[in-house]
Amino acid sequence: MKRKVLDVGQCNADNYRINELLQKHFDAQVDRSHSLDEAIEAAANTAYDLILINRLLDADGSAGMDVLTSLKSNPASADIPVMIVSNYQDAQDQAVQNGAVVGFGKAALDSADTLEKLGEYLGETA
């Protein structure tokens, strides 16, 4: 069964890079949302294996942490693993304190460490 990932708040270029990585290494289907409301709706209607949230949403500059806390407080999505996509360690630490699993930064997108983190939720690399 194909793994499903929701990618929230990435610009077109970063969404493309993440999508390519997830398809190549995990044969994952990647859906995209641009806002808190879209993410909440998508998570309520699809069984995602992982949600990736940009630290700052590209469409409006809003905080990805707000998306994280909303998803984690919603019974429909509270159990879905969520990662914040950020190069900043303080953002990663804050995300984990708010219920996320350890994420990664875009600078480390192609690293073995990132693939290992993603593999914990998406299975073996393809």
What are these regions (language model features)?
Residues 2-13, 18-22, 51:
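Conserved acidic segment of CheY-like receiver
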Residues 34-50:
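Acidic, metal-coordinating helix/loop segments flanking the phosphotransfer/catalytic sites
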Residues 44-46, 72-78, 98:
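Conserved phosphotransfer cores of two-component systems
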Residues 52-71:
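Conserved phosphotransfer microenvironments
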Residues 62-63, 87-104:
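Alpha4 helix (beta4-alpha4-beta5 surface) of REC/receiver domains from two-component response regulators
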Residues 78-89:
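A short, hydrophobic beta-strand element within the central beta-sheet of small alpha/beta folds
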Residues 108-118:
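C-terminal output helix
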Residues 119-126:
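The C-terminal output helix
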